[in-house]
Amino acid sequence: MKLHDISAYQTSAEHFFERLQAWDVDLVLDVRLHNTNQLAGFTKERDLDYFVREIEHATYVHDPEFSPKPDDLSAYLHKTMSWEDYAAAYERDLEARGAVADFFKKYGSYHSVAIVGTATDKRKSHAEVLVKV
């Protein structure tokens, strides 16, 4: 299985879908905590589900099991938690909940998975951590 992280932010639809096509993804796994507001643009949950099916002919799943804890995300976004502490807390949480094993049970049959996160020019995303664990 190949894992890729991709940001839903600061990207055009063209660039987003070109990357998915280059990776030949068969699953787009959305692990964002909040993916329904207008700021998400073309990557809002319902829109992204449609576009992934119609453009990429892949499966789209929003799975909050792999989202960060709301308090940790808030602390990171408000700069009261460093990236290193946030990434470590997220990894500990995944391990404590057995989420890594769940990931492979749920998605182990896919050959190329794009994990949707929220990285920007100014911040990293928990999707980057999930790809590595």
Provide a role label for each language-model segment.
Residues 1-133:
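Residues lining hydrophobic/aromatic ligand-binding pockets adjacent to catalytic sites
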